[in-house]
């Protein structure tokens, strides 16, 4: 087994699901496990969520849903990114529920379901202001009227997506108002939906009116609030610890260089520890000279350029030996390195930091 592993706490995952349920009330959870469950391992996380009674999964693409089906998961699977006509057959064959905003795709679903003698299901995706994907609210009624002619297709749900559910709530409320107006228009014309969903992680907290009967938590499942100011309210527990072991310790002297490009020149005698983790594992090269790690509950800084497979740490004169545990994300003793800490150093968001952890890092599920 590799020394570099991601340890996933099922106990912390259960805590986070319980917290989301307590806030969401009667709304059921669509557990968003796209992008390899935000880097946590889709099959492992889906297995743990099944134990917790989660009945709906959200994925980005049909191929993610197919992987779940081929691994025996029977939950409803909603494909959250609109698919092309060519993937309509996959959605029907694997009983996936895609979002729909193209009538041509709706026709393709109908054809495939009719040919198979089954019923295809979809959720109408309304664009309320993000301008990324979705159907214009002005076209929603016309779409539903035309869709009545399509055999073996049930538009069982309707949804939208917020652009600013953590910061600009004025805009988010405008989106919610537009979504509600669209719902009212469709309802007045005889169209109701079994499932309605809009609330992502931020909206579950900040826009309780947007919860409807389904909510879509993503990063909150994995222990990180959508913004730092919601940390206390949510009281989540990060479920991932990224850790490795020291594989080499060497003594260097004043004037010695470390790593590619001779970018680090030591100003005195010190010890350097090498660990088997690098940007090939998803630990960004952009963290060079910026990030720290934990050894024995103490913070140490990286020196030299972070390589594809290894990185180097200034351990000074401390007694550190090969085999000692090194934590890159998570707790060790009383110290904690969060994905937020690393994302701040990279000028990005914690979603990217965690999702970037590559497939060659084994995910180990504990508790």
Q: Can you annotate each of these PLM segments?
A:
Residues 4-15, 22-197, 211:
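Active-site-proximal beta-alpha core segment in soluble small-molecule metabolic enzymes
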Residues 2-14, 63-64, 83, 90, ...:
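Active-site anion/phosphate-binding pocket segments in diverse small-molecule metabolic enzymes
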């Amino acid at each position: 087994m590799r020394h570099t592993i991601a340890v996933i706490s099922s106990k912390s995952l259960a805590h986070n699901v319980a917290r989301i349920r307590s806030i969401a009330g009667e709304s059921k959870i669509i557990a968003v496990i796209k992008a390899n469950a935000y880097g946590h391992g889709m099959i492992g996380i889906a297995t743990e969520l099944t134990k917790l009674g989660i009945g709906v999964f959200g994925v980005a693409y049909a191929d993610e849903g197919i992987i779940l089906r081929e691994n025996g998961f029977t939950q409803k699977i909603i494909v959250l990114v609109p698919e092309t006509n060519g993937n309509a057959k996959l959605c029907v064959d694997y009983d996936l529920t895609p979002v729909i905003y193209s009538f041509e795709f709706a026709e393709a679903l109908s054809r495939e379901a009719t040919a198979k003698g089954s019923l295809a299901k979809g959720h109408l995706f309304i664009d309320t202001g993000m301008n990324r994907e979705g159907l214009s609210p002005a076209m929603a009624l016309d779409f539903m009227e035309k869709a009545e002619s399509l055999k073996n297709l049930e538009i069982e749900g309707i949804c939208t997506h917020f652009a600013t559910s953590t910061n600009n709530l004025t805009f988010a409320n405008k989106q919610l108002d537009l979504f509600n107006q669209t719902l009212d228009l469709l309802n007045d014309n005889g169209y109701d939906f079994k499932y309605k969903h809009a609330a992502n992680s931020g909206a579950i907290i900040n826009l309780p009116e947007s919860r409807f009967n389904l909510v879509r938590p993503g990063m909150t499942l994995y222990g990180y609030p959508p913004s730092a100011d919601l940390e206390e309210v949510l009281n989540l527990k990060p479920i991932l610890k990224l850790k490795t072991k020291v594989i080499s310790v060497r003594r260097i002297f004043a004037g010695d260089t470390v790593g590619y490009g001779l970018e680090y020149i030591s100003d005195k005698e010190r010890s350097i520890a090498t660990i088997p983790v690098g940007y090939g594992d998803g630990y960004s090269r952009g963290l060079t000279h910026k990030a720290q790690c934990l050894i024995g509950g103490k913070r140490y800084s990286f020196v030299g350029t972070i390589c594809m497979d290894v990185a180097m740490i200034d351990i000074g004169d401390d007694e550190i030996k090969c085999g000692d545990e090194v934590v890159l994300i998570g707790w060790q003793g009383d110290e904690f390195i969060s994905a937020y800490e690393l994302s701040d150093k990279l000028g990005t968001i914690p979603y990217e930091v965690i999702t970037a952890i590559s497939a060659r890092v084994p995910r180990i599920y504990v508790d």
